[in-house]
Structure formats: structure tokens, C-alpha cells
UniProtKB/Swiss-Prot annotation:
It comes from the Bacteria. This is Uncharacterized protein SH1032. One of its GO terms (molecular function) is 6-phosphogluconolactonase activity. GO terms for cellular component: cytosol. It comes from Staphylococcus haemolyticus (strain JCSC1435). Belongs to the cycloisomerase 2 family. Transmembrane segments: none annotated.
Length: 344
């Protein structure tokens, strides 16, 4: 069985843009990695059945690009929307009705919303750039707002964004007119919320904090997040610099995975109480440096991790579908400056 996927990359050093890879799920080996489309700063990708969207920039102009996906995984450019000079994004997602694309811009501390043509995949226009104006945290990296994630809530009623600079998670109402603040959830000073993964039941969320290296289990209801418990994602005695990165759930909703850049590891937790709790299982080395993103195959059999630094290795782990534990496979493929992983 062959599974195809994409890796998005920085293009500051050796990265080329969007890579296309093939994973042989019988052997656990990535058989090929090719440049799917050479494009600048494609650091995050979002997909629908027929289309792929990528963060990009040209000179000072920043925004997103739209592609048509072929069955082979090859990409054909539809158009680009580069209407902003306020900085390159770090996260994008598509609304469930495929009419909107949302973008988080870490450096400028803003959220963007674009209008899409769901039939052709075209990006029609940038609707809005929204600034955050909340009290800042006290960490040295919280000098201003830093929006790091934006996505639709499971009930499809709202859009939720994390703000690393203000220790807040903000939910918005959204429409053709743009985003409108609905509710704000505050976390601990110097947490630095980065990404969110929701349980499939829609009642619980796992919010990972880049600065404190904790994951919060939160009760989610009508745009509000209430923390129930929190867990450290690196060993307590690890004192070197490390920054938490990505968070993903296994498709069976039994295991949560979190990557740590610096400690260069993946923390594994069992999900308990129908989503309301976590039990630490293990912390395994990711196999290279700066594991900014990873993803899990639809079969739940493998976890594929990209690395932004070091030798740029794509590491493949075999999952124990009973315990969630990870066992590395012997894989030799690379994707320079890889920072996003998703499957077709």
C-alpha cells in the first residue's frame, strides 16, 4: 500500500518549496521525495479534495497560492493572492464549506481571511487583516501579538486563533464581511499558546504552549476554552532551550502526539475519559533537529516527521495501534527545511 503526501518547507537555505513523497506502508519506507512545486516560503499547506493552498511570498508581498491537485499528487498553479505587505503567514486552513481560507501571521500578529471560489479553487480576494490588541505576556518573546494558528471550530460556528504573545485563544464569528471577536480565553503568563487539536467529539481541545512547553487539556463550549489539566512535554530535568511545536491526534482518538524543537523529540500521551484527560506514555527522539511538524497516516500505522534543521531527515515511525508507542524505521530520505507534513 502506497500513501502519498506533501511536505512544505522554508526556502531560506536549501528548501525548494512543496515536496511530494510516497510512503510504502508495507515496508515503512519513503520510496521517493520529489519537488512537487518550487515556490517561496511554503511553510504551511491546507487541502480540500481537489485543491491545495500554500503560504507564499514574492519580495515584500505576502499571501497564499492555490493549486489543482492531480491523482498523481502533481500540482498545477491556479492563482496567487499576494495583497499584503504585513508579513508571511505561518498557518492556514480552509473553512468546512470551502468558501474561506484563514491565515495566521506570527510576525505581524494578525489574522487574515480570504474569499475562495469553492468550485474552481481560485483565491478571489483578501477580505480582511485583523490585528490583536490584548495585554502582553511577560516573556521576552511576548513583545507584541503573535498569531500562530487559526482554524474553524468543530461545530463550524466559529474560527479560533492562538496568540503566543498575549497568552490568549480568541474565537471569532466569520462571514463575507470578515472576522468579528466573539470570546477570549486566557492562559497562564508565559505559556505562549501555539496550536490546537480538537477531539472528534468536539467537547475537548488540546492546546500546546510553545514557551512553557506544556499542553493544556481544555473543555470547549460555545467559543470558550476552560483548562482541565496540563502536562509537560519534555523531561522535567531538561534545562536547555526547547520550543514545543506541532500537535496531532491519532485517527482512532486514542493517542496525542506533540513535537519538541530543541529537545528534538515527540511526546506521546494516551487520551482518557473520552477526551477529558491525558496520561504520559513516552518521549522519543525525533531522529534529527527541529521537528516542526509531523502527521499520521490514515491507517494509523505510521507517523511521518519532517525536520527544519540538521540533515533535514524525514523520519518514519511505526505506531503500536494499541499503546500509541513509536518505533523508528530505517529511512534515508530528506526534505530540506521541511516544516509541514500532510497526506493526500
Amino acid at each position: 500500500m502506497t500513501t502519498k503526501g506533501y511536505i512544505g518547507s522554508y526556502t531560506k537555505k536549501e528548501g525548494k518549496g512543496i515536496y511530494l513523497f510516497e510512503l510504502n506502508e508495507d515496508s515503512g519506507q519513503i520510496s521517493s521525495v520529489n519537488t512537487g512545486y518550487e515556490i517561496e516560503a511554503s511553510t504551511y499547506l491546507a487541502q480540500t479534495d481537489d485543491y491545495l493552498y500554500a503560504i507564499t511570498k514574492e519580495g515584500e508581498h505576502c499571501g497564499v497560492a492555490a493549486f489543482k491537485k492531480e491523482a498523481s499528487g502533481s500540482l498545477t498553479l491556479i492563482n496567487k493572492c499576494l495583497e499584503s505587505v504585513e508579513g508571511t503567514g505561518c498557518y492556514i486552513s480552509v473553512s468546512s464549506d470551502h468558501n474561506f481560507l484563514f491565515e495566521a501571521v506570527y510576525g505581524a500578529g494578525i489574522a487574515r481571511i480570504y474569499q475562495l471560489n469553492k468550485d474552481t479553487g481560485e483565491i478571489i480576494k483578501l477580505i480582511q487583516e485583523l490585528n490583536h490588541d490584548y495585554p502582553l505576556g511577560s516573556h521576552e518573546r511576548q513583545e507584541h501579538s503573535h498569531v500562530h494558528y487559526i482554524n474553524e471550530t468543530p461545530d463550524c460556528k466559529y474560527v479560533v486563533a492562538t496568540d503566543l504573545g498575549t497568552d490568549r485563544v480568541v474565537t471569532y464569528e466569520f462571514s463575507n464581511e470578515g472576522l468579528k471577536e466573539y470570546k477570549v480565553s486566557k492562559f497562564k503568563d508565559q505559556d505562549g499558546p501555539r496550536h490546537i487539536a480538537f477531539h472528534n467529539n468536539g467537547e475537548y481541545a488540546y492546546i500546546v504552549h510553545e514557551l512553557s512547553n506544556y499542553v493544556s487539556v481544555a473543555k470547549y463550549k460555545d467559543g470558550q476554552f476552560e483548562e482541565l489539566e496540563r502536562h509537560l512535554t519534555v523531561p522535567e530535568d531538561f534545562n536547555d532551550d526547547t520550543k514545543l511545536a506541532a500537535v496531532r491526534l491519532s485517527h482512532d482518538q486514542q493517542t496525542l502526539y506533540i513535537s519538541n524543537r530543541g529537545h528534538d523529540s515527540i511526546a506521546v500521551f494516551t487520551i482518557t475519559e473520552n477526551g477529558a484527560g491525558l496520561n504520559p506514555v513516552e518521549i522519543v527522539k525525533s531522529g534529527d533537529q527541529f521537528p516542526r511538524d509531523f502527521n499520521i497516516t490514515e491507517s494509523d500505522d505510521y507517523l511521518v516527521c519532517a525536520h527544519q534543521e540538521g540533515n533535514y531527515e524525514i523520519t518514519v515511525f511505526k505506531r503500536d495501534t494499541n499503546t500509541g508507542k513509536l518505533t523508528p524505521t530505517d529511512n534515508q530520505q530528506i526534505a530540506p527545511e521541511g516544516v509541514h507534513v500532510s497526506f493526500i
